[in-house]
Amino acid sequence: MGIRSAIVKAVKKQMPPISATEKEALASGTVGWDGELMSGSPNWDKLFKYEKAELTAEEQAFLDGPVEKLCKIVDNWEIQKTNDLPPEAWKIIKEEGFMGLEIPKEYGGKGFSSKAHSAVVMKLASRSITAAVTVMVPNSLGPAELIGAYGTQAQKDYYLPRLANGTEIPCFALTGPDAGSDAGSIPDRGVVVKNEKGELGIRMNWEKRYITLGPIASLIGMAFKLEDPDNLLGKGVKDLGITVALVPRNTPGVEIGDRHAPMDLPFHNGPNKGKDVFVPIDAIIGGPEKAGKGWAMLMESLAVGRSLSLPALSTAAAKLSSYATGSYSRVRKQFGTSISNFEGIEEPLARMAGLTYLMNAAREATLQMVDAGERPAIPSAILKYHLTEGMRTIVNDAMDIHGGKAVSNGPQNVFSTLYKGIPIAITVEGANIMTRNLIIFGQGAVRAHPYTLKELDALDDPNPNKAFNKFAKVLAAHLGTGAVNAVKALVHGATGSRFAKAPKGVDKATKKYYKQINRLSAAFNLAANASLPLGGNLKKKERVSARMGDVYSNLYLASTALWYYEKNGAKKEEKVLVDWAVQHALAKAEKALDDALENHPLKATRLVKHIVFPRKLLTGALAVGTAVAAFVAAPVVAILGAVATVGAAIFIKDHQNKVPGDYLDRKVADTIRHPGEVRDNLTNGVFKPTDEKEPLGKLEMAFKLSVEVEPLEKKIYLATKEGTISKEQPRAKLIEAAVANNVITADEAAKVVEMDRLRRAVIMVDAFPQAAPAANDAPKATPAAPPKVA
């Protein structure tokens, strides 16, 4: 017993320590496909069991009706000037049920699926970030979701109908000056007391900031730490922990109403404070029984919320950017040709289209998991980080291609609000730096690993003998599986994954990708196992965690892209998009794994690189064998060994996945610089106005006409080259001459003239008159002295 107790104690020291709040976070959510990727032997049936569900007729009608109407009403430039949505927009949001998208119908909500919820946010975000955030927040982590999941029946009956119809405007107060990314350390306190009337309640003090909808909220969902020094709740615990309660705005002691200006986007966001605020004990969401259970509630809800809101907003930005930039690059001319023909434009166009496909595929797949009842904590973190980073990349590419058109603010600029929204998306719901460095692999290595959590649970048994027996059993399975994955990683690394398995029934042209994912999954599991000896230091070695998280994330993104391609019918015309998306993700995963092992703080783990990337190991072993054979006078063996050594050096490739090449880039860029079904599908779900008064409507008209006019322009150009007509004349005269000389018809000339008009309208930017200063305020210029004449 003494020896076993000592062993258990020693092993515990090596395992990563987990705080109470971390345990609650790890216990929240579910493990699904993320666990398969961590296992080293992913069962693809567990991914393909999710169908790509379509919206119901009611959900589609809501998108085509109220959402379309709201998009037409909101105008970013007017919103910027008035610092708010127009009254008509607020009226629609409340009356049409935008604030209760997933609240059940029996409580007055829409009862929509998560897929529909995401579709609503995505379409709104493509039109107005302010409108999208205004709708997003009441439907995400906050009072409605928490009451629906954990509230008492009385809370549901009273609040959910009022939240659904907009009678109550909610906000959720978690972040404060001293608790940002480390939200679990919130200093805000509530004490269980009895007031002067003898009523049991909580006296609260808090200081919060960055609270969206806070300035106009009527109901605050408040996160705080609850204390019960007099044991009035009878739980026998003084520090109960993080709790969530409902605080009406008009409660005495609440200070609320001031606004922040997040990147000057005018959605309502601001600070609030509470000084000796008293609320009844029944204000706790879920009642007194849920006192101290707030962190688990928040983590459970966040596992779903992070799958919906920001991924939808980010994908909207990606789709809109691809839609508008592909067409603008075709319409805009420089150096006598469409700028879409330049390779310098082609490269970012391909990146935009490929990343848009990758992002939307991950969004769609994860939504199916949520609608199937899962709470995908790790996938939601992956989406939060990688889709907002994808938004950053794509919008920046769009800005580069649009140039001054995107820089000059005004009613004609469709990108300025998207660009301003990037740092907000990057920062909220878990800052991206923290998400990448701490959460994706930091939590995934424990909760999604097939054995780590079981080993920790075994060690927690208070009986050392039982703890030892449980741990030994799990460890044996862990080591056995780890050994199998090590062999698989080595064999697949040496053979180019030729003998790796691919699921049956998938497009044959994509089977190589499944094999690579299987190989990298085994290698990832091996590297994860080899990182566990870091124990508690794993949290401090953030660069290890970040790189391993990149491997994990890109395997998830690649696999969901393949899922989306198959569920979308494996259409031949979309093959270039899935090729680009998967090649991009696998190359990043492989590079991240190489970097993680190359820079690993443990020497033994660095040696794992020679198993995962075995070229040096195998060529070295063959060379040694050849030398030994030569030494013992076995010339035939020596010759064969030499041939094998050279062959291994030539044919074994450590990095089996390359980034998309120029040819594929060209094909992918074509998907958005040419009209057609692929472009329509890729950008489906965003607001696409058809009115010429709208910048996007005008651009789309010009884009489609440009396809008709380009052959006519070529005829005119060739006529000038052949001397049929002179190009040294005004544009109008040139077109007249082309008609007169039968180069083009009069009807065709009318199209060319219309194209010139539309192109001019598209490339124009806004300009504003400068207000004339009062006479006494006019600057006084001092004329420069004339130069002296020698």
Q: Can you say where each PLM-predicted feature lies in the sequence?
A:
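Flexible, small-/acidic-enriched active-site or ligand-binding loops
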Residues: 252-278
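A glycine-rich, basic-preceded beta-loop-alpha segment at the flavin cofactor/substrate interface
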Residues: 273-306, 323-340, 487-509, 520-539
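C-terminal amphipathic alpha-helical interaction region
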Residues: 477-790
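Charged, glycine-rich active-site and insertion segments that engage polyanionic ligands
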Residues: 374-406, 576-589
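Amphipathic, small/basic residue-rich leader segments at the start of a protein or domain
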Residues: 1-138, 145, 149-169, 181, ...
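Loop-to-helix element that buttresses phosphate recognition and phosphoryl-transfer chemistry
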Residues: 344-371, 396-399, 555-564
